């Protein structure tokens, strides 16, 4: 790890084991082959953050980029080339008044390679990053985990109102698009969603 002012950097090696054997339920179009597998992955990430607080910030920017290379023997995966993933997250707070803020965000993940293992497929759902899977992206309107194609991008806009001290109401709208081919992403499938939430800080 490296920390310098508002910048954080990390790089290293991960060892993970997934004891997948079967699914309790799969849809007719969700045909995934799973088995217990171990992985060695190399990773690097950089994070620039100027948000004034961790929860319900009033101002600032968060920009994070990460890259991971996945293998099962430090060099290859399943006897061939390893696969990798690139992720990007951006969020900023635009105060409209002392109580009302606009929070635009943009994030996505791209898988590179044609031999991706199930535990690292792109997934969205829920309100926070990494809710059930480390690579899971939030998406208002989907409360479960949804597996998507190899390239996914989400644009989100939140309107947050502070009421009566530390009470907050947030209106969220988001749009996502996904495709197996990043270079034809705009020809992919679209997702729309939204939510209205309350929170106390």
PLM regions: where:
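Transmembrane beta-strand segments of outer-membrane beta-barrel domains in Gram-negative
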Residues: 1-97, 174-181, 188-190
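Short, loop-centered acidic/histidine patches that primarily coordinate divalent metals
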Residues: 162, 172-176, 197-201
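Extended hydrophobic-aromatic, low-complexity segments
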Residues: 150, 165-171, 180-184
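Short, contiguous acidic/charged loop-to-helix segments that flank catalytic cores in large enzymes
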Residues: 143-148, 182-188
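Short alpha-helical linear motifs
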Residues: 35, 85, 128-129, 195-197
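C-terminal outer-membrane beta-barrel translocator/porin domains of Gram-negative envelope proteins
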Residues: 43-47, 51-164
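C-terminal beta-signal and terminal closure region of outer-membrane beta-barrel proteins
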Residues: 186-201
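Secondary-structure boundary/capping motif
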Residues: 98-100, 167, 198-200
């Amino acid at each position: 790890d490296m920390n310098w002012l508002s910048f954080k950097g990390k790089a290293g090696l991960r060892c993970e084991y997934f004891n997948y054997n079967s699914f309790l339920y799969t849809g007719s179009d969700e045909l995934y082959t799973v088995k217990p597998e171990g992985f060695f992955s190399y990773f690097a990430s950089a994070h620039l953050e100027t948000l004034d607080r961790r929860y319900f910030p009033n101002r600032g920017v968060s920009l994070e980029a990460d890259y991971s290379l996945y293998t099962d023997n430090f060099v290859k995966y399943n006897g061939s080339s390893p696969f990798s993933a690139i992720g990007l997250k951006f969020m900023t707070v635009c105060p409209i008044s002392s109580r009302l803020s606009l929070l635009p965000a943009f994030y996505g993940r791209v898988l590179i390679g044609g031999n991706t293992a199930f535990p690292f497929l792109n997934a969205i759902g829920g309100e926070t990053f990494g809710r059930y899977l480390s690579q899971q992206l939030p998406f208002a309107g989907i409360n479960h985990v949804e597996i998507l194609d190899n390239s996914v991008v989400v644009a989100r806009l939140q309107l947050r109102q502070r009421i009566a001290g530390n009470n907050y109401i947030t209106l969220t709208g988001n749009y996502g698009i996904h495709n197996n081919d990043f270079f034809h992403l705009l020809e992919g499938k679209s997702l729309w969603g939204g939510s209205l939430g309350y929170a106390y800080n």
